[in-house]
Amino acid sequence: YQLEISSWDKFSITGKILETILQTKDISNKNIWIVVAMPNKWSKAELIVQKLSEIWVDEIYFRPSERSVLKDWNNKKWERLQKISQEAVEQSRWWKLPKIEFVKNIFPVLQNKKIIVFDMVDQKVIPSCDSQANIIWVVWPEWWFTQKDYENFWKNFDLISLGDTVLRMETASIVWAWSLRNSLR
């Protein structure tokens, strides 16, 4: 905004808005849900939460995969992730904290949603998303999905790739979320 300040004191500033310079679209009704396999280090989980919160992801689900080193978390870890998320949301000037959960049983989260799995086996690019679609995006675990992951977890899914570049799972989570958020604008 371009403002004209008429007065100020210790507690308030009074002024008039002369011009709105930046206009943004309302994207508050366009949801992004991401399922991420538990990484092998807590610092990676913290990075994922921080960056996905900055990108305005609505729900972040961590799940143990067959190859996950970390299989569970406690309240102290969850509180730390919440604090990281809040700081990231404040920094990015958003108003809504993402829901952050650890789920051992992913099936209730997946119900009534189109599942798109981000994997290296297919070369499709990210589709343009219907803003009203219930789509949940799933990012691979470290060392990729196993055959058991495919058989047990994903029955009705599409495979998507960001291309030939092999990305770490935390980088893929961030790149994918950013691409999705920008496609919904």
Describe the residue ranges of each PLM region.
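RNA substrate-binding interface of SAM-dependent RNA methyltransferases
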Residues: 25-114
